Amino acid sequence: MANLYRSVLALALLTGSSSLLAFEITGETFSVEGTVTGVELTADGGTINAVGNAGRYGKVFLTWNMTLNPNSDSQGAFTGRGMGIDDDGNREAGSRYGVWRRSGTTITTFSLDDVTDGNQNLCR
């Protein structure tokens, strides 16, 4: 009987834990297309500046202050800032916190941005 209880408990835990690992991100999506306007390298990483267009935020100016992971030459963390001005002249700004990885010559960033319009954007 004790084995039956353990089996039922194990099954319940396995079934419940799999739903905790799955979630769906919903909401508005948009792409940012832009141009790198500056790169400054340091011994610990560097700073990248870019300008582009980002959906409802209009023309955006972005900065990534990147640090290297001491155990990997192809990943690290970053902080940054962003500012956008839409077609109506409205200005929004935000703080960026995230991680990055490099594959060949392409750097991909993943961040959570806290924006002055009250949104918290999950960015890739």
Regions found by a protein language model. Give the residues of each.
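Beta-strand-enriched cores of mature, soluble protein domains
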Residues: 21-124
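Bacterial N-terminal signal peptides that target proteins for export
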Residues: 1-8
